[in-house]
Amino acid sequence: MRSQPHVLSIVLAGGEGKRLFPFTADRAKPAVPFGGSYRLIDFVLSNLVNAGYMKVCVLTQYKSHSLDRHISQSWQLSGLAGEYITPVPAQQRLGKRWFTGSADAILQSLNLIYDEDPEYIIVFGADHVYRMDPEQMVKEHIESGAACSVAGIRVPRKEATAFGCIQADDDGTITEFLEKPADPPATPDDPDVTFASMGNYVFTTQALIDALKEDSEDENSAHDMGGNIIPYFVNRGEAHVHDFSRNVVPGETDRDHGYWRDVGTVDAFYEAHMDLISVYPVFNLYNRKWPIHTSDDSNLPPAKFVKGGIAQSSIVAAGCIISAGTVRNSVLGPGVVVEEGASVEGCVLMDGVRIGKGAVVRHAILDKNVRVGDNALIGVDRARDSERFTLSQGGVVCVPKNYELHGADED
């Protein structure tokens, strides 16, 4: 393992994820399945572990059972070596109240910092799809002498109005942090792009503690990391931007270098899946030099295709059975069954979905354990779909967890 300063990683995983409804109706956003075999939180945890950061606290709150279980079952490290990835629910250490913001979540968890006594603290979000080497950011943070570093991704200025935007000088010192500005600032070296905050931070420990305590005394604060804590450091001239375009991950290609996606809406979530199944995806799941880790599916049998069942341009996870059915341009999670004569096209099917004989499912996302009856139709009649399900702005049909759709002959 590479020699490193003493670092504690904190992952903020308490988000409700309302824009991903109905897939967050029963789980926290970081626990939403992604890419057939993963959960959203697997990406940030993989980045930390691949970089050698093995002391990780995941702060949870909203409907966290699924997330807690996934972390406990899939991310067991060697306690003998002092390594851990542990979910930490709201402890109510500062009174009988829940987290009121991301900064308050860390404030209420200061005991974790005091117990570990790190030199530096990584604070990352839990619900983005990307590869990143956090060690490079920590090293740059130390060399900069700043108290706070913010990872910034270069985006076209005309598209940056939906982000927290960073204005920095030539040496990377952040001079202004603007939340969703109408006129985003340009980067020092390119007038057509701006630095958008990725929600990933590195702090010198005592500086973060001081900022959190001062923020807690401000009755007008939203106690938010991006909205309050980062501006605190910017105003003091103590914030530095880490240019994500310079973060190089082993095994990456020119095509997927710098890939980062906020999949916080249904349409963004769907489009990220459709990228995965393209011939040359922008994001490569198959980079073995910087793998995305998740639960071990070795207890599931391999996917099986029988009676002429086929899958084209698709990702099919372990335990799936395609029996005389057809799957095209889709992502199937573990244990999905597609029966005789059924057609699945342009879909994301999560764990345990069953598609009945002769059913047609198109342009849809089906949550875990959905049952689609024989000859039933989804994504064929928009008016009918809108009566039964949620439709995204882009027209993606969203079928909630455990839903049972009767077959055509049962209506």
UniProtKB/Swiss-Prot annotation:
Binding site for alpha-D-glucose 1-phosphate: G164, E179, K180, S197
Sample GO molecular function, one term: ATP binding
Disulfide bond annotation, renumbered to this chain: none
ATP-binding in keyword set: yes
Record's catalysed reaction(s): alpha-D-glucose 1-phosphate + ATP + H(+) = ADP-alpha-D-glucose + diphosphate
Pfam families linked: Hexapep_GlmU, NTP_transferase
Enzyme class: transferase
Kinase in keyword set: no
Stored Gene3D superfamilies: Hexapeptide repeat proteins (2.160.10.10), Spore Coat Polysaccharide Biosynthesis Protein SpsA, Chain A (3.90.550.10)
EC number(s) reported in the record: 2.7.7.27
Keyword annotations from UniProtKB, A to Z: ATP-binding, Carbohydrate metabolism, Glycogen biosynthesis, Glycogen metabolism, Nucleotide-binding, Nucleotidyltransferase, Transferase
Pathway(s) it belongs to: Glycan biosynthesis; glycogen biosynthesis
Family note: Belongs to the bacterial/plant glucose-1-phosphate adenylyltransferase family.
Role, per record: Involved in the biosynthesis of ADP-glucose, a building block required for the elongation reactions to produce glycogen. Catalyzes the reaction between ATP and alpha-D-glucose 1-phosphate (G1P) to produce pyrophosphate and ADP-Glc.
Subunit-structure text: Homotetramer.
Name of this chain's protein: Glucose-1-phosphate adenylyltransferase
Species of provenance: Corynebacterium kroppenstedtii (strain DSM 44385 / JCM 11950 / CIP 105744 / CCUG 35717)
Gene coding for it: glgC
